[in-house]
Amino acid sequence: MGVIRILSLLVILSCSCISTLQAAEKLTIAAGAGYRRLVEQLSTAYTASTGVTVEQIFGNMAQVTAQAQESSAIDFIIGDKEYLDTTPLSFAQECVVGSGKLIAAVAKGSALKTLNDLTEKTVTRIAIPDPKKATFGRAATEFLSNKGLWQQIQDRVLIVGTVPQVTAYVISGEVDVGFINLTEALAIKDKAGLLIPVDEHLYTPVLIVAKRLRQSPDSQAANAFITFLQTGEAQDIIKKQGL
């Protein structure tokens, strides 16, 4: 009986250690604010599948990368590959998530019907994310310049910090139109008057990737997240979020 009791205790202790290890597993993912809903849904599904807790950080890409440089706690950054490749951050792994698309979200009640209407006097305020810090701010200014509209409307452009801030201005009607990404646009389709896709040939393609920082511990949780992104469940989420 003594041997059996000892073996039973060893099994209990072993299971306890495994449970403690699993509970301690955590990932920290930082992402562009325009992909909050995508990251939230992916994180929820990943946690349900693995039991691993996911902490999420959002901001424009300049904010996100600056925080990653200052902190060793961030495991992944999800955002524009071109922007991330120009930073001093060192990455160990990369997984393509999808292609980001620029959308003009028109406020309810605005007279704007097409992007050619941007030059009309009835369009008084146009919001874009900061082009120096946010991917879709850069994409918006590229489009407006390549379309030959920038010089005519720049005095009516309101530059804000992030995509969600642009969204807030559109929903409140404080601007006539705002430039955001498709993922964000899908979330507000019932709160905007009109969503106009922007010609993808008039701005640099936006490839959204998940990059694992080299500073991230080589944990089972991190490896499992890369694998998870390639599953059918994750791909369905990504597709529904406009990527």
Explain the meaning of each model-derived region:
Residues 23-49, 55-57, 62-243:
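Exported/periplasmic ABC-transporter solute-binding proteins
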Residues 1-6:
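Positively charged n-region of N-terminal signal peptides that target proteins for export
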Residues 7-17:
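Bacterial N-terminal signal peptides
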